[in-house]
Design a protein with these regions (language model features):
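Bacterial N-terminal signal peptides
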Residues: 3-14
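Beta1/beta-strand and adjacent pyrophosphate-binding region of the FAD-binding site
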Residues: 19-29
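Structural recognition of the beta-strand scaffold that forms the well-ordered cores
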Residues: 24-26, 47-50, 57-59, 65, ...
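Solvent-exposed, acidic/flexible segments
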Residues: 29, 88, 92, 324-332
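N-terminal Rossmann-fold NAD(P) dinucleotide-binding loop
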Residues: 32
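Conserved N-terminal/central alpha/beta ligand/cofactor-binding core
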Residues: 38, 44-45, 49-121, 152, ...
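Flavin (FAD/FMN)-binding glycine-rich loop and adjacent Rossmann-like elements that form
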Residues: 124, 129-154, 158-535
Length: 536
């Protein structure tokens, strides 16, 4: 029977400070689990350090519908796991069973505080004990700094944020590059994806009165130029409207003034709870720049009135733990407050109020956090900058790296970046969604090279980074799908074990030795023949 005890290890070994491992995986999301199991199966002594008290990241934290891109691109040990199409709690249990079967030790609720390096390699990491709260949010400050020290021969940073990578002194970027940086036609800031005829100012028509809550004065770069914005983060909520459910409680700091945008929308007859409205024409609702999405639930999810406060995650990607804790909690409070507003405010039409009153949180998904999802959907944060940067050229089939460790196949999938005033209206800035690459001659399938998951050798010789890979922003909008990160995690785990056995740097792992091991895992690293391809 598995033992999950916050703040300590589970497994066969009780550890003391500065215990040593062959491989330390930082981040127990799906990619981290795959990396740890792959390294352990190769004979390495492995530990996973997970900042929260749950395994699986977004795969076990609310994602549910997992985007594959081309079905045949998903391979290796990842494929049979995702083929079963589990629910959140089931994925978490599957990942725990995998780690236990592989003999991997797991440390929950510890996050990296400092990194010890010498001679270009990480020698050990100091970990702070920082338990998440009862609703699944991280703390601003740790309970105990320097609570554990873990030494390892090779480290794998599978975190969504790239925290170990950054603390190890590895070069990285965040935000959007300009078109000119890598010669990418889709790069840089984009036009508004939607413009709403709602006055953005506290006092209608008066910019001096300040912006309504929920809007930002964020500077948005000219189209095609670089900025530091990241696409919106949020939670994948498990709302139910019938039967038993867990209550959605208002936040302690609830203030109805925070939802003045909603009041003004209701005054103009905008049904903010209907996907029909977001897919159709509404008086005063405009489309701009060819960036409005069409079809599917994506319209509503990427619209102004969605369970994500677009732009509010500014500062998260390269922020400290206190900044991230604030953003994480504010995103949760936003949806809790929005629900309470819809239930109680006099401005809400009867039909919308009825829907909100019937809403609850699904039982069985996140019961130990009162039904609230425990993983913020960090779609993109830092990106390593290494000797090989995956770009739009790779996606378009204009590059053919010879050291592939996995293939990706999703289109460009961005979400809005900021909610700002524009000419007296409210604009949802940026974001682009295109499945174009699935229809191109190269079928949207492209290789991810080994060089893109290892740092430059003069920066760190014993670190692999299969999540915050070396890629441009545009390439990351495609790579960022969980199956790809799982595939790259498994490849990184195998490479780490080879580096340990040979006593060499990760950059010097012979691809001639790595390739057959990946193929033995049924990992596809070569492009499939054209007749094999089909979308999923």
């Amino acid at each position: 029977m598995l033992r999950f005890i916050a703040g300590i290890f589970f497994g066969l070994t009780t550890l003391v400070a500065a215990d040593s491992f062959d491989v330390c995986v930082y981040g127990g999301n799906a990619s981290g689990v795959m990396a740890a199991c792959a390294a352990a199966k190769e004979g390495a002594k492995v530990i996973v350090v997970e900042p929260s008290r749950w395994l699986g990241g977004m795969t076990g934290g609310g994602l549910m519908h997992i985007d594959w891109g081309r079905e045949e691109a998903v391979s290796g040990s990842t494929r049979p796991i995702l083929k079963k199409d589990h629910k959140d709690a089931q994925y978490r249990a599957v990942f725990a069973e995998m780690l236990q079967a592989a003999g991997v030790t797991v440390l929950f609720e510890h996050r990296v505080g400092a990194v010890e390096k010498s001679a270009g390699a990480i020698r050990a990491i100091s970990l702070d004990l920082a338990p998440f709260d009862e609703t699944g949010c991280p703390p601003a400050a740790p309970m105990k700094a320097g609570a554990r020290v873990i030494a390892a021969k090779v480290f794998i940073d599978c975190s969504y944020e790239g925290d170990l990578m950054a603390r190890a002194g590895v070069a990285y970027a965040y935000g959007r590059e300009a078109k000119s940086t890598y010669g990418e036609s889709l790069a840089g800031a984009q036009p508004p994806m939607s413009i709403y005829a709602i006055d953005p100012y506290v006092k209608a028509g008066d910019p001096q009165s300040g912006l309504l809550p929920g809007l930002q004065s964020t500077p948005v770069a000219p189209v095609g130029e670089a900025d530091k914005l990241t696409m919106g983060y949020g939670f994948r909520w498990r709302f139910v409207f019938k039967g038993e459910s867990l209550p959605i409680e208002p936040p302690a700091n609830y203030d109805p003034k925070q939802f003045e945008l909603y009041r003004r929308a209701f005054q103009q007859g905008v049904d903010i709870l209907s996907g029909r409205v977001m897919r159709g024409k509404v008086d005063g609702w405009e489309k701009s720049g060819g960036r409005v999405y069409s079809g599917g639930a994506g319209n509503l999810a990427r619209a102004l009135f969605a369970p994500t406060n677009y732009g509010h995650n500014a500062g998260y990607a390269d922020g400290d733990y206190a900044t991230r804790a604030r953003i994480w909690k504010e995103q949760q409070d936003f949806v809790r407050g929005m629900t309470h507003f819809l239930r109680t405010d006099p401005s809400v039409p009867a039909k919308q109020k009825e829907i909100a009153l019937s809403a609850g949180l699904e039982k069985g998904a996140f019961d130990d956090t009162k039904g609230y999802p425990h993983q913020l959907y960090v779609r993109e944060a830092r990106r390593m900058v290494s000797d090989y940067v995956v770009t739009q050229k790779d996606m378009e089939g204009k590059a053919a790296p010879a050291d592939s460790v996995g293939i990706a196949s999703y289109g460009v999938d961005e979400w809005p970046y900021a909610t700002v005033p524009l000419d007296g209206k409210v604009a949802l800035m940026g974001g682009y969604y295109s499945m174009l690459y699935l229809e191109d001659e190269h079928r949207g399938i492209y290789r991810i090279p080994y060089r893109s998951i290892v740092p430059k050798k003069d920066q760190c010789t014993n670190l692999l980074v299969p999540v915050c890979v070396s890629a441009s922003h545009i390439a990351m909008t495609s790579i960022r799908m969980e199956p790809v990160w799982m595939i790259l995690g498994e490849s990184a785990g195998v490479a780490a074990s080879l580096a340990v056995k040979a006593g060499t740097s990760v950059q010097d792992v012979p691809y001639a030795e790595l390739y057959p091991k990946l193929r033995a895992l049924t990992q596809k690293v070569d492009l499939p023949k054209k007749k094999e391809t089909k979308p999923k």
